[in-house]
Amino acid sequence: MSASAVSRLGWYARRAAQMSPAEVAWRVRDQVVRAAWSPRQVTREQLARTAYGTPARDLTFTAVLPPGTAAQVPAEARRRVLEAADRLLRGEWETLGVLRTDLERPDWFRDPVTGLRSDPDKYAFRVDHRSQEKVGNVKQVWELSRLHHLTLLATAWFLSQDERYARRVADHLRSWWRENPFLSGVHWTSGIELGIRLISLAWIRRLLADWPGVADLFERDALAVRQIRWHQRYLAAFPSRGSSANNHVIAEAAGQLVASCAFPWFRESERWRRNSALLLERELIRNTFPSGIGRELASDYQCFVAELGFAAAVEAEASGHPLSQVTWDRLGAMADSAAAMLDERLRPPRQGDSDEGCGLLLDAPAANRWPSLLALADVLVGRLDWWPRPAADAGSVIAGAFAGRRHQVASRPGQRPSRFADAGVTLLRTSGENEIWCRCDGGPHGYLSIAAHAHADALSVEVRYAGIDILADPGTYCYHGEREWRSYFRSTIAHNTAELDGQSQSSERGPFMWARHAQAREVEVIDDGDIARWTAEHSGYASLDPPATHRRSVLLDRASRSLDIIDEIEGRHQVRLAFHFGPEVHVELDESTAALSWPQPGTPGAARLELPGVLRWSLHRGETDPILGWYSPGLGRRVPAFTLLGRGHCVPGAPLATRLEFLEIGRPSKPVLSWGISDARVCQAPEIRAEA
């Protein structure tokens, strides 16, 4: 047996250990069904021998936009869409940080990162999409086939009536139809991809409704009709379930619902619509806390799930089959929590995994999709007085016009919340310009037994000044192919928290699998105006000898514009305390004091970080052996950034005190507030070692 086969068997064994007996039984049955479906595969050779022609019966598309919608799009938003569309006509498009220049005639199977091309004729359920050696970087391959570039081109046609955009959409779609027949190749291996693709197809047809060639591209083309049915048959037959029912099941249900409403052309359409609506409503509630925070505790996926939920809800409403008030209430909570978490630059937290997934693209791509989400939510559920005010964009105007009305949602906060107790997320922040923004993590590890998109980041903090990352969450960087990097970016030492005895708080069993979950709880959250204080603890080190509990308190003094961080650890253990900085921050270390500086308009930013003197501190940047000192601005990208690492031993009753003070010219430092706890001199620093 090959090494890869042995590794694969090991993965299956570890994965099965995270499942219930019922899920194991269902997955066995699912594998049997997948094998039994192999005769249903349609190859490209078979497709070439088949003359599909036109459908046997007349089909119509009625889910169109109201007259005058295009004229409502702001001029600046229109300009951005057309500029991006013109670049696309030249073959230029960025996918997950990679600028592609080959999109005049795209190769749907080629990975632009590795240059590898997966087998387009292989039966989908025999494609090992997790193997970078066989398919390349599968996220790159999948991303293009979500067809977001075609929804953008369709939007450009809708706003300009320029024939070039519509013709390019038609060329690419017909290419995709031909190159990706049913169950052939990598684009039929994951239901989330099919769900997103169906949403894109519905909106492409809608945006091109007045283009003379659109009916020949869709309902008069038997292959196009068959592709739309194939996608829905797949989603009905192979849903995500059990410990995998995270954002994937939301995308699958949303895509099925959108397609069955927009293309009700098949005998199964009504059943697909009912089932997908029930599934979506159930899973939206399961996947989000009542506060609106996503249970995956991965900020980027909260935006993604909200986009999918709104896209499906709008489609259902327009088709005359609205979703329940409970679902709209939860979507409203998701929007309110999103509005509350953004910093003064409208940047979201960077908690957990991020793959920049997009539910629907009707605008020029942006690095930060959250302002667009709020603009859409403003149209659909209404903004509250305390919300930030992002500018209207093409997507919010167009989707809002299609929705037709604004929904009233219940139980909305009268002022901006700073604590989401059910999710263990608390924000300590100042008001006015040059905002100090601090996210504190004191909640569950992640969602479901594998917590696929969680990081080992309990009690970590993320601190920004005027929207600039100071103490930064390093991000995600990669999913497949670079296991050492994947493990690092998820690890405890990669976050602004404490690691004990060289172990992460939660134990990793695979790139999307955690075996043991550190559970954190908030002990106290107090905000009396000038002072805000947060205290939480976690049990991730209860299995050590002796058992250990890590408790952290963070105090924001708004008057002195400073943060104090106090770490208390039960049990005598080796400790590594890490502080990671954003790529804009320069750090100079002098024993246990670090001088921080960064560029900003006017006077450069500056801060002083007083570190626990009982630890031995070292400064790192862009190191690979071992990995340390990196920041990932997005999936597939990493840049060097400073990291401070303190090493030592701690015993009970010996807190580690850290103070971050933001400096302003002419303002004297304020003395450190008394915490009512003993000093930390009883910790001992170890000998200097070569390893980090």
Regions found by a protein language model. Give the residues of each.
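Aromatic-lined, polymer-binding surfaces characteristic
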Residues: 120-122, 128-335, 339, 347, ...
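Residues that flank catalytic or metal-binding motifs in active/ligand-binding sites
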Residues: 145, 252, 334, 422-424, ...
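Membrane-proximal basic amphipathic "stem/tether" segments
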Residues: 1-57
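CBM-like, beta-strand-rich accessory domains located in the C-terminal region of large
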Residues: 195, 354, 361-365, 379, ...
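Cytochrome P450 core scaffold surrounding the K-helix E-X-X-R motif
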Residues: 449, 471-482
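Extended, charge-enriched "interface" segments that sit outside catalytic cores
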Residues: 32-132, 139-144
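Carbohydrate-active enzyme catalytic cores, enriched for enzymes
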Residues: 293, 297-471, 523-528, 651
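A residue-level signal for conserved active-site and pocket-lining positions in enzyme catalytic cores
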Residues: 256, 338, 428, 567, ...
